Design a protein with these regions (language model features):
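Amphipathic alpha-helical polymerization modules
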Residues: 1-152, 215, 219, 234-241, ...
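Short, flexible helix-adjacent loops and helix caps
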Residues: 107-114, 382, 799-802
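Polar/charged heptad-repeat coiled-coil helices used as signal-transmission/dimerization stalks
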Residues: 156, 163-167
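Extended alpha-helical or coil "stalk/linker/tether" regions that are enriched in polar/charged
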Residues: 681-716, 722-727, 734, 741-742, ...
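Short, surface-exposed polybasic-and-hydrophobic patches located at secondary-structure transitions
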Residues: 149-159, 776
Length: 913
């Protein structure tokens, strides 16, 4: 018998005594189907040895950490790129090495001996996350795409509030029924309603005493609407226009209607003519607006907004609102650490929001009852994302304490707010200090003056450049709009400094005051004759100076108060000057009452010509100080803090107080003390709200314009500044830059992005509960890369957009292989990960290890393996599988081969080799 030993079916069995078909247990063949061969052909990446399989000693953990800290960045692609690896492999290896360094830092923090060591490691870890995100977003690629968080084809910006509402204005709900008596109204109130369109306006009086009693929403609505309808429309000659029935045609179409759209009954103002509608109560008592901070050992400071209604009468204090910057990363951290459990019906989950330190430094109230608060926050306010360590903020509140809008300076380094004032043109002026990067310049600590319009759009910002670290403390605006800013300069060991700017913010003049010691300007004001008043500390001596506002070098007089800490300054309508502060000994001047023996708060009344002063003490014998003062209708009001008992028993570690002092005699009329157990009260800032104790809040309304006016500019609603930028790369093409303009809106920015992305992405502005967002969505088969604008000028972070690569898979092709090399993989990382605590480090370590595993998976996706073959053949990964027809063919081959093998068994047993 002749045997064909070259047969492809029998060859292996003749040589080895076995056959290849016996390797297929469970009917799984070890040969490549046509589908496998087609899919495998796409896997062309050259073989490489990944870092995690390379031989070498990593060294001890401490030596690894030391080496990492010496690196300029944890992302070090040099050794990898020098090997000329394929782009996908190079990116995967670089990402792995960076993650491995983050792992070492996290492991060291878990076992770190002290909190200070972990804090040091946290700085390196946070910077490493940032560097890794930047690298991953723009890493070289061919078939493999990595994402810092999760792969996505779409991103959305922070929400931008829509422009001011028009047509209909909804008030706050205040009653359960429209005809229910409004108990907070006496029925004798009088209102002035002003309706304006262009140059035309009318102020309409409404007296509730002539209507039904007690007042209800229905009765007040009728009174207001009847009064508005009684104003006739007149022709050019002054004659009254009549309708077809001979009745006068109303000039205005505004109507106040009871409405329940907010859940309870209030007012809805229908305004089909789009007029500007304002309201105020006539002859209402005065009020004080109070802003202060409360801190405790377990939480950062936030700003509380309060109002004292009728402070010369009933003096009713109420808390209206709070200003607190959101700590975005701490909030996300809390969400990461929160226990996971199913919702329980009727039980509300605790809030996971975490807040950053937010402190107010100054407040001013306008004639319409709105207030402006300036200060410093380390968190986000609405769509204003803090870009550096902290930022200056400006918040507008309506007469009821509701936030109308919030603004941040947008400094990429550090900025702090110091003072706020109103200009004669209605503009808002703020002063502060900026350190680090700002508007493309690096500052070492410079004073800044910024101007805003009534809608919160920035009009100008002026840095007062000087060598060394200067600090702004004070601000004043004169009747002609001239702006004065004061504080402490760095020269001479610390000199008092004053600068004058014109009404448009241009710097015109500087002056330094050097007593030979440590000097500073603590407060500024405009005197009754237009002169500049500067309250200074000169070598520890409190001094009030009168300075020529047209030429700062000319002193017009001065008065010394002694060794005091004088910080507050105000001017009465008759020219009397008020000074507030603290002192540990008697203040120079006529003594109205006795000192307390400790550090005492004081208020000094100084004559306009600086020839005399009278001093009143607010003292307990403990620690007392006055932070702010204001004049209003024959009284001086002082806001401050005490660690003693001024008007009742102290509640907190330190309490706040507001004192009323007779402006003529200096006698202390009354004091309100307030605080919370275990809490420390921050400086108390007050502002006079003349006529501010109205009943409008009881009607769900507010003083002034009833529609909230807010700028639609991105440079107003976000922390973006003109000149900030980012770039877009489409399908690995050339990066094209987008620069933010001063008048940028969501619409104009969307248009800029659309011009670059063209048909490769969908750009929309979807609307949500918080406003509209910028949405960028890569279209199928295309890649959109978002690139940050660089240090100090990055627009992406301020828009809430990541530096990322948006990848949209190509359309599904039924004829394409089931498995292709590469793909999109997410590292599932976040900047909320931190290693400053052992708990946080343990969580971060787990996430980094998962990211390492994902990077290894991404690398393996570039190479063919049996698992991929199984998927192509229709089985689950790693299980194999063949079609029934293929299995039947294999069974026949195995049967034939078995018979051949039995005939040739002797070749092997006989020592064929």
């Amino acid at each position: 018998m002749t045997l064909n030993l070259n047969s492809s079916l029998a060859g292996l069995s003749l040589l080895s005594g076995t056959n290849s078909f016996s390797l297929f247990s469970g009917g799984t063949p070890a040969f490549e189907t046509l589908a496998v061969r087609r899919a495998k052909a796409a896997f062309t990446t050259p073989d490489t040895t990944p870092p995690w399989k390379q031989a070498g000693q990593a060294g001890s953990l401490s030596s690894q950490v030391s080496a990492i800290r010496r690196l300029s960045s944890i992302v070090d692609a040099g050794p990898i790129t020098s090997r000329k690896l394929p782009d996908d492999v190079s990116s995967a290896f670089t990402t792995y090495r960076a993650l491995d360094r983050l792992r070492a830092l996290a492991e060291a923090a878990v076992s770190g001996p002290t909190a200070s060591v972990r804090e040091t490691l946290q700085g390196v870890f946070a910077e490493g996350l940032q560097d890794l995100e930047t690298f991953v977003a723009s890493s070289p690629r061919d078939k493999l795409s990595l994402a810092f968080d999760q792969p996505s084809s779409t991103v959305r910006s922070v929400a931008i509030k829509p422009e001011s509402t028009v047509g209909t204005i909804a008030g706050k709900g205040v009653a359960e029924a429209r005809d229910a008596p409004l108990l907070k109204l006496s029925g004798t109130e009088r209102f002035a309603i002003t309706i304006k369109r262009g140059d035309a306006s009318d102020t309409i009086s409404v007296d509730l005493s002539g209507g039904p009693q007690p007042p209800t929403l229905d009765s007040i609505s009728s009174s207001i609407n009847d009064a508005i309808a009684a104003v006739p429309l007149r022709g050019p000659d002054g004659s009254v226009n009549l309708d077809e029935n001979g009745n006068p045609v109303p000039r205005w179409l505004v109507r106040f209607l009871p409405d329940k759209s907010t859940g309870s009954w209030g007012f809805k103002i229908e305004n089909p003519g789009l007029e500007e509608v304002s309201i105020d109560q006539v002859d209402a008592p005065d009020a004080l607006m109070v802003v202060t901070g409360l801190t405790d050992p377990d939480s950062p400071a936030s700003t509380q907004v309060m109002r004292i209604s009728d402070p010369a009468g009933t003096a009713e204090r109420s808390t209206l609102s709070q200003i607190a910057g959101l700590d975005r990363l701490a909030t996300e951290r809390a969400e990461l650490n929160a226990p996971k459990y199913a919702p329980i019906e009727g039980v509300e989950k605790p809030s996971l929001e975490r807040f950053a330190t937010t402190s107010a430094q100054s407040v001013v109230t306008a004639a319409d009852g709105s207030s402006f608060v300036v200060g410093t926050t380390a968190g986000d306010l609405d769509a204003n994302r803090v870009a550096g360590s902290q930022d200056l903020f400006l918040t507008k509140l309506d007469s009821e304490g509701k936030v109308v809008w919030q603004r941040a300076l947008g400094a990429s380094g550090s900025a702090s707010g110091a003072a706020v004032a109103l200009g004669p043109d209605g503009h808002v002026v703020v002063a502060g200090t900026v350190e680090g990067s700002f508007d493309g310049a690096n500052t070492d600590g410079d004073m800044l003056v910024a101007r805003f319009d009534a809608e919160g759009a920035e009009l100008s910002s002026t840095l007062i450049r000087a060598v060394g670290k200067d600090t702004a403390n004070a601000l004043a605006v004169s009747a002609d709009g001239s702006i004065f800013v004061g504080g402490r300069g760095a020269t001479g060991g610390g000199d008092a400094f004053i600068a004058r700017l014109d009404a448009d913010g241009s710097l015109r003049e500087r002056r330094r005051i050097d007593s030979g010691g440590s000097d500073t300007v603590n407060a500024l004001a405009i005197g009754s004759n237009g002169e500049l008043l500067a309250l200074t500390s000169e070598g520890g001596v409190g001094t009030l100076r009168r300075i020529d506002s047209a030429s700062l070098v000319n002193d017009l007089g001065s008065i010394e108060l002694g060794q005091v800490d004088a910080r507050a300054l105000a001017v009465a309508s008759d020219g009397t000057i008020g000074i507030g502060g603290s002192a540990s000994s008697a203040v120079d001047g006529n003594q109205v009452n006795a000192t307390g023996g400790g550090r005492d708060g004081f208020v000094a009344r100084v004559s306009a010509d600086l020839t005399s002063s009278d001093v009143s003490y607010i003292a307990t014998g403990a620690d007392d100080r006055v932070d702010s003062i204001t004049f209003m209708n024959g009284n001086i009001y002082a806001g401050g803090r005490t660690s003693g008992d001024l008007s009742g028993t102290r509640r907190g570690t330190s309490d706040g107080f507001v004192a009323r002092i007779d402006a003529g005699t200096g006698a202390i009329a009354d004091i309100q003390q307030f605080g919370l157990a275990t809490r420390n009260t921050e400086p108390v800032r007050i502002a006079a709200a003349t006529g501010g104790s109205t009943v409008l809040g009881a009607l769900g309304l507010k003083r002034g314009r009833l529609d909230d006016t807010d700028s639609s500019l991105l440079t107003a609603q976000t922390s973006l500044r003109a000149g900030d930028q980012f770039a877009i790369k489409v399908n690995d093409g050339v990066a094209r830059r987008i620069i933010i303009d001063a008048d940028e809106t969501l619409a104009t920015l969307s248009e800029k992005v659309s011009r670059i992305t063209g048909t490769k992405a969908t750009i929309t502005s979807p609307s949500g509960d918080d406003g509209r967002t910028l949405s960028i969505a890569a279209k199928s088969g295309h890649t959109i890369e978002l690139i940050g604008g660089g240090e100090g000028r990055d627009a992406l972070s301020k828009l809430g957009l990541p530096a990322a690569r948006l990848v949209a898979p190509p359309p599904f092709d039924k004829s394409a292989p089931k498995v292709v090399p590469g793909g999109s993989y997410g590292l599932d990382l976040t900047h909320a990960l931190e290693i400053s605590t052992r708990e946080g480090a343990a969580l971060a370590l787990g996430r980094v290890k998962s990211a390492i595993s994902m990077t290894q998976t991404a690398y393996r996706s570039l190479y063919w393996d049996t698992g991929k073959a199984s998927i192509v053949n229709g089985g689950a990964a790693g299980t194999g599988g063949a079609s029934p027809r293929q299995l039947a063919q294999i069974a026949n081959y195995q049967d034939a081969l078995a018979r051949i093998s039995s005939l040739t068994a002797g070749f092997n047993s006989g020592g064929f080799f």
